[in-house]
Amino acid sequence: MVHAVKLSELSKRKRDVEEDSDVDISTTDSESDQDADGDEEIINIDFDFFNGNPGVDFHALKNLLRQLFGQQEANRMQLSTLADIILQSPTTTIKTDGQESDPYCFLSFVDYKEHRTSDYAKYLVNLDPRLETFFATIDNSDKTCALILCERLINMPVEVVPPLYNITLNDVSSNSSDGKHFDFYLVVSRKYEVSFDMDSDSEDESAKPRKRVKGSELDYFHEEDRHMEKYAKICFQGPTRKGVVPLYMVLDHEGLVRSIGDLEQAIASWK
């Protein structure tokens, strides 16, 4: 599978990801600095969507997994084994320099029941009582669950996310023996603390100028998580480490599809 996408038209229209033909797309980098005249730098980049390549992608996937989980959590699991599982599962990577180059982004749907004895599945089951209960329910039913793993370099544009998900979901259905999708999805992601200064409260406002104190709020590393969280059946956060907060969400199929649709609409509204 190869889907060639040029970043420029992702900003101009929604992409029908089920088209087999290449799509020519160009966009303005949303994070590029404007010069004194207000002009924006235009960056044209070709993004190619490939299936996971075991002969090329292994080490890059391990690095992206380490970025996703953070070093401390990554040390609690066998990343090499997890990378192998990802490369055996429906996985889409995004590259800019051909199939033999390192991926800048990946999305994988790992079948929980197929890999329930894996180190990663056991890690998730033991992570929180809510997940333990959820997986026990899946184990004792005919329902299916995919463990979603998705990470990208920080400068990857969010516009690639809807086609990335739609392509991979289509691959899952196409490669399934019954042509069906998964019933549930567990998404592991993260947020980060945004620090800011604020005025401290004082009972006597006339006594002294109010002090500036540090506050913080949370924002998303992955913009799609903002929309997924709205539809999550289970959603909770892990302990904060160095300003990074793990995020865990369980969605049903309808919720996942709707969240990606909402992201597409949000992206279209930015233009």
Swiss-Prot record:
It is found in: Cytoplasm; Nucleus. GO terms for cellular component: cytoplasm; nucleus. The keyword Transport applies. GO terms for biological process: protein export from nucleus; ribosomal large subunit export from nucleus. It comes from the Eukaryota. InterPro entries: BCP1_family (IPR025602). It holds the Pfam family BCCIP. One of its GO terms (molecular function) is protein folding chaperone. Keywords: Cytoplasm, Nucleus, Protein transport, Transport. Residues 1-37 are annotated as: Disordered. Belongs to the BCP1 family. This is Protein BCP1. It comes from Eremothecium gossypii (strain ATCC 10895 / CBS 109.51 / FGSC 9923 / NRRL Y-1056). The lineage of its organism: Eukaryota, Fungi, Dikarya, Ascomycota, Saccharomycotina. The gene is BCP1.
